[in-house]
Curated annotation (Swiss-Prot):
It comes from the Bacteria. InterPro entries: KH_dom-like_a/b, RbfA, RbfA_dom_sf, Ribosome-bd_factorA_CS. Keywords: Cytoplasm, Ribosome biogenesis. HAMAP family: RbfA. Transmembrane segments: none annotated. It holds the Pfam family RBFA. This is Ribosome-binding factor A. It comes from Syntrophotalea carbinolica (strain DSM 2380 / NBRC 103641 / GraBd1). Monomer. Binds 30S ribosomal subunits, but not 50S ribosomal subunits or 70S ribosomes. It is found in: Cytoplasm. One of several proteins that assist in the late maturation steps of the functional core of the 30S ribosomal subunit. Associates with free 30S ribosomal subunits (but not with 30S subunits that are part of 70S ribosomes or polysomes). Required for efficient processing of 16S rRNA. May interact with the 5'-terminal helix region of 16S rRNA. GO terms for biological process: maturation of SSU-rRNA. Belongs to the RbfA family.
Length: 119
């Protein structure tokens, strides 16, 4: 059964966290971060926040540390901005979907280049 409320809450959390990243967070470890999705459990106690970041592996690790250390800040600000009885616990996870998509695109491009032409 699909629960519409966690989906709506996830969308709202995505908007609010993105806004907080732009205007409120002052951690230098958190650079060019994009929140790609937020998945909220049906009981509304856990939200997985998926993000991408511009940079190499070292930048990703620093961003992860920065986001984890800012989790109390995010929860406090979300509690002020949203009318919810309980603000979900936030778990930040790097979104590998973009890398996966780029890899598939690269493989398809290689296949097209290696394909002999039928002229």
């Amino acid at each position: 059964m699909d629960h519409p409320r966690p989906h709506r809450v996830g969308e709202q959390l995505q908007k609010e966290i993105s806004a907080l990243l732009l205007k409120g967070l002052k951690d230098p470890r958190v650079g060019f971060v994009t929140i790609t999705a937020v998945s909220v459990t049906p009981d509304m106690h856990l939200a997985r926040v998926y993000y991408t970041v511009y940079g190499e592996e070292e930048q990703r690790k620093e961003t992860q540390k920065g986001l984890e250390s800012a989790t109390p800040f995010f929860r406090r600000e979300l509690g002020r901005r949203l009318r919810m009885r309980y603000v979900p616990d936030l778990v930040f996870e790097f979104d590998k979907a973009l890398e996966y998509g780029n890899r598939i695109e690269s493989l398809l491009r290689q296949l097209n280049e290696d394909k002999p032409s039928d002229d």
